[in-house]
Amino acid sequence: DSAAAITLRRAEAPRPAIDTASAEAYRLTVDPETGITITGATDAGVFYGGQSLEAWLPVAAYRAPSSPVDVPAVQVLDAPRFAHRGLHLDVARNMQSVAAVKRLLDIMAFYKLNTFHFHLTDDEGWRLAVEGLPELTRVGGRRGHTLDEQAHLMPSYGSGPHPSPEASRGSGWYSRADYLDILRYAKARHITVMPEIDVPGHARAAIQAMEARTRRLRAAGDTTAGRAYRLRDPADTSEYESVQGWDD
């Protein structure tokens, strides 16, 4: 019947009397005669109206999703005060699975956050596979006990002795397919992914990884290729120590 209908509309939605990011404005109406109507100025506005409807549903709707529920009548006129509403996730120091990232994106969407600051690299890890530079993840994407860091980085942040991704959140990375999957998932929820690649500071994982690449290519007799992408200047004789105790 009409009371059970949900209508989605793209139109100029009325806005509260504040200075707002009007492109994401929406109106949510729950009416016993006409049903549920969500009107948004854009697709994002309609989407956010749907998120507000989810929040408005009684708890019974989640306890028994297939059972009928009574939805209280309401009219909501809403628009964001700030165009940029972000959340930051640091996976460089503590790796998170694709499934965990997607759960976070769902929570962001529910709270109408629209920018995901995805911290993919730092001193302690490089988490995005790059074609042609396997050491970035094979070396820079793993942490574990080591005497020379030639195969992987040393432990940090309680990552433990084992360098395998299955054993520690200090290890792991996203393949190209993983990353594209995350981008598509975010886009469907009107979230912009802002990848954060730290350079020139906070780049120790990349530096160590490129040193491993240089060693591999030199051992194969390709010194010229080994110099490409190297981040350490062998002629630099300066001495220093970082707050973490690193001198390389």
Describe the role of every protein-language-model region.
Residues 90, 118-121, 194-202, 232:
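Generic beta-strand/beta-sheet core signal
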Residues 36-40, 90-94, 168-172:
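Second-shell loop/turn segments in exported
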Residues 46, 101, 175, 179:
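Aromatic/hydrophobic pocket-lining residues that form the small-molecule binding cavity
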Residues 87-123, 127:
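A conserved hydrophobic secondary-structure block that centers on an alpha-helix together
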Residues 83-85, 112-114, 187-193:
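Short, well-ordered coil/turn segments that N-cap beta-strands
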Residues 1-84:
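Contiguous, structured surface segment used for ligand recognition
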Residues 42, 108, 193:
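Conserved hydrophobic/aromatic pocket- or pore-lining residues that grip, position, or stack substrates
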Residues 124-188, 203-248:
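Aromatic- and acidic-residue-enriched carbohydrate-binding clefts of CAZyme catalytic domains
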